[in-house]
């Protein structure tokens, strides 16, 4: 077994001492329960949000399709983000909630597993892919939509323990 690559002087773990990109060796880490929650929004025109809520768009049920896309995105994260480990996810939940007071859809994704590395990237990817799917399905009526505030909300497990966004 090789030793995990040490972090660089500035704490980055995906580079070796020569500055080359590496996938971190997690073989020596303990398996723990790990959960990550990420969130984000798709801001849009009021008429676009109304069409989503009323299922009035030609491409179909935007929220259901985006929910499935987010789940698929979490599962495909290591295919999209080069240094992510392939993980045996035990849970992926994606929620899309219309927010008419702010003309947006709020997206939340929760990913979980028992393993040696966290699921933050999977949760973030789920939110991003769900948001991109909302955009794709609505772009014919609103090209000015914006994906905003994609961020990690919380994570538990692993050596660093629990973290919650302030």
Swiss-Prot record:
Keyword Lyase included in the entry's annotation: yes
Record field: catalytic activity: (8S)-3',8-cyclo-7,8-dihydroguanosine 5'-triphosphate = cyclic pyranopterin phosphate + diphosphate
Molecular function terms, GO-annotated: cyclic pyranopterin monophosphate synthase activity
Pathway(s) it belongs to: Cofactor biosynthesis; molybdopterin biosynthesis
Record key words, sorted: Lyase, Molybdenum cofactor biosynthesis
Active site: 136
Superkingdom assignment: Bacteria
Listed InterPro entries: MoaC (IPR023045), MoaC_bact/euk (IPR047594), MoaC_sf (IPR036522), MoCo_biosynth_MoaA/MoaC (IPR050105), Mopterin_CF_biosynth-C_dom (IPR002820)
SUPFAM superfamilies the record matches: Molybdenum cofactor biosynthesis protein C, MoaC
Entry binding sites for substrate: 83-85, 121-122
Record GO biological process: Mo-molybdopterin cofactor biosynthetic process
Enzyme class: lyase
EC number: 4.6.1.17
Keyword presence, Transmembrane helix: no
Pfam families: MoaC
Family: Belongs to the MoaC family.
Known function: Catalyzes the conversion of (8S)-3',8-cyclo-7,8-dihydroguanosine 5'-triphosphate to cyclic pyranopterin monophosphate (cPMP).
Subunit note: Homohexamer; trimer of dimers.
Name this polypeptide is given: Cyclic pyranopterin monophosphate synthase
């Amino acid at each position: 077994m090789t030793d995990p690559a040490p972090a660089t002087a500035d704490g980055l773990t995906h580079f070796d001492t020569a500055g080359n990109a590496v996938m971190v060796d997690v073989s020596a880490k303990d398996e723990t329960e790990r959960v990550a929650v990420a969130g984000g929004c798709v801001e849009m025109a009021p008429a676009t949000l109304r069409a989503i809520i009323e299922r009035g768009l030609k491409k179909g049920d935007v929220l259901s399709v985006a929910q499935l896309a987010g789940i698929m995105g979490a599962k495909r994260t290591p295919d999209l983000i080069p240094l992510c480990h392939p993980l045996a996810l035990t849970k992926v939940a994606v929620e899309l909630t219309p927010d008419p007071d702010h003309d947006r859809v709020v997206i939340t994704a929760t990913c979980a597993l028992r393993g040696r590395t966290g699921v933050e990237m999977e949760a973030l990817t789920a939110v991003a892919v769900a948001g991109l799917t909302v955009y794709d399905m609505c772009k014919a009526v609103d090209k000015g939509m914006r994906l905003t505030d994609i961020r990690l909300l919380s994570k538990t497990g692993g050596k660093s323990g629990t973290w919650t966004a302030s």
